[in-house]
């Protein structure tokens, strides 16, 4: 039996950015290089097709191409989480089964929502995750993020963990994340196999103190985040604090300034990928914001700026 003390997956699982050519098509050669860099940088696993992967700008056919291409290229080097969020229970279940068939180690799904106003009651959220669970034999990570506009209380999340077979991991990104993680672990006990930090590691130390065993971050500097997690896990808390303080300016800049385009800007600057452009209509990173990002990063000498040279 797995539990929070013996999870199947722990550590840093950064989000893989989706790479596009300047013309907007998928750039699979760059995609493979991005994956190789992220593994070389110390990622314990990867997450694909998340919000930070611009999943909302990708067609269903492209989802299949990306999932197959990345999982075949990873070839078991690290476990891969595939994001399968959708408003429809049927679509999310089908996406999740397809991810499992292609080799995913886990799926991640937000609660069903659409736009700014379409939400469903708690009973339907429970049934949504239960039906997805029934369709697959790999763990589900519930993504509790403000983007869904859906309140998921710690008691409700703990109930799903106890009563739905595959619901075992939780990425908490809401305000007061550490307190919610702490309460979730208290209420759910061993059913909470993976309490995870998210939101680009901006609350990482508080979340680790609350009991988080994993972190889903941006993909630009896993080599900076992994040693923090390792130090904390090994009881070297002063070392963890010192390392976090060193990387915090870059973590903060990603979380509050350069956002979803951070990893691609760093990867493009380091020669890992050919283009950092997002898919239209998302605007490109402002030149001043990009320059500040690189100035902060160069002080830390992350692998991303050296890997391809």
Curated annotation (Swiss-Prot):
<dbReference type="InterPro" id="IPR002220">
    <property type="entry name" value="DapA-like"/>
</dbReference>
<dbReference type="InterPro" id="IPR013785">
    <property type="entry name" value="Aldolase_TIM"/>
</dbReference>
<feature type="active site" description="Schiff-base intermediate with substrate">
    <location>
        <position position="171"/>
    </location>
</feature>
<comment type="subunit">
    <text>Homodimer.</text>
</comment>
<dbReference type="GO" id="GO:0019570">
    <property type="term" value="P:L-arabinose catabolic process to 2-oxoglutarate"/>
</dbReference>
<keyword id="KW-0119">Carbohydrate metabolism</keyword>
<protein>
    <recommendedName>
        <fullName>L-2-keto-3-deoxyarabonate dehydratase</fullName>
        <ecNumber>4.2.1.43</ecNumber>
    </recommendedName>
</protein>
<comment type="function">
    <text>Catalyzes the dehydration of L-2-keto-3-deoxyarabonate (L-KDA) to alpha-ketoglutaric semialdehyde (alphaKGSA). Is involved in a degradation pathway of L-arabinose that allows A.brasilense to grow on L-arabinose as a sole carbon source.</text>
</comment>
<dbReference type="GO" id="GO:0042803">
    <property type="term" value="F:protein homodimerization activity"/>
</dbReference>
<dbReference type="Pfam" id="PF00701">
    <property type="entry name" value="DHDPS"/>
</dbReference>
<comment type="similarity">
    <text>Belongs to the DapA family.</text>
</comment>
<keyword id="KW-0456">Lyase</keyword>
<keyword id="KW-0054">Arabinose catabolism</keyword>
<dbReference type="GO" id="GO:0047449">
    <property type="term" value="F:2-dehydro-3-deoxy-L-arabinonate dehydratase activity"/>
</dbReference>
<dbReference type="GO" id="GO:0005829">
    <property type="term" value="C:cytosol"/>
</dbReference>
<dbReference type="GO" id="GO:0008840">
    <property type="term" value="F:4-hydroxy-tetrahydrodipicolinate synthase activity"/>
</dbReference>
